[in-house]
């Protein structure tokens, strides 16, 4: 596993490269539809501005020992995208409209402030709990949360503009840490959208070999799920893929059916059950 310092440096490099990408983005591309249903490319950037401000505030408070929810926010662990997706979509559009021509400049300023804050955390500060609606999170793991966010939203933008877009391989270890440790908006709980209770649970097994290995079962009961590392029971469906496909599936960027049809996801077991996986794991 990479150290905090190594992950922090990778996050910083990726964030700065993403800033450069936006500096060179033609004006016409800012008004294109992104992979996020309700957002233009510029709306995605406005969302990143808002999260920069939130992360900076919650980490600054957390390292001072203040971890209570800000006014208007749910208790840590009580928030979920199903409760806030519509409001989030509208607020990001409103922020983009308000920022106007200063959107890029504001994004870079807020992003750089957050980069300096997160990469400058001391070893003691990294362990201090900080508020997030998804869960309490050690300050140091906000590096992983922001890294994941930057890379996924980069995919949301680039996949809508370029013929081939993928996830940065440098980010995959941070994403796996978030999933396995169940941290806030990087967790499977955040990605899972509850449905009707199933009479019989479905056991999905992931066998991910590279570049970051993951072997785990996700047992879906319709209205809830559980994550079982290294489970030994027989699976209903076994998925085999690279880590970037695993991440895109978990965070709802591609469906299981699409990944199967494009040859990115190998399946053992019931094809119908395999394709149903994405009705539960939608991300935001």
Walk through the language-model features, giving the residues of each.
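Short, helix-capping/interhelical loops that line the mouth of catalytic, cofactor-
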Residues: 1-6, 55-120
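Alpha-helical scaffold segments that form or flank carboxylate-/histidine-based iron centers
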Residues: 1-9, 30-51, 91-103, 130-148, ...
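Helix-loop segments that flank and shape redox-cofactor active sites
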Residues: 19-40, 61-65, 120-136
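A generic secondary-structure signal for well-formed alpha-helical elements
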Residues: 22, 48, 52-59, 63, ...
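A short mid-domain helix/strand-loop element embedded in enzyme catalytic domains
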Residues: 86-87, 111, 115-133, 144-160
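Acidic, aliphatic-rich amphipathic alpha-helical segments
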Residues: 123, 139-215, 279-284
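Glycine/small-residue-rich hydrophobic helix-like segments
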Residues: 197-243
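C-terminal interaction segments
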Residues: 231-284
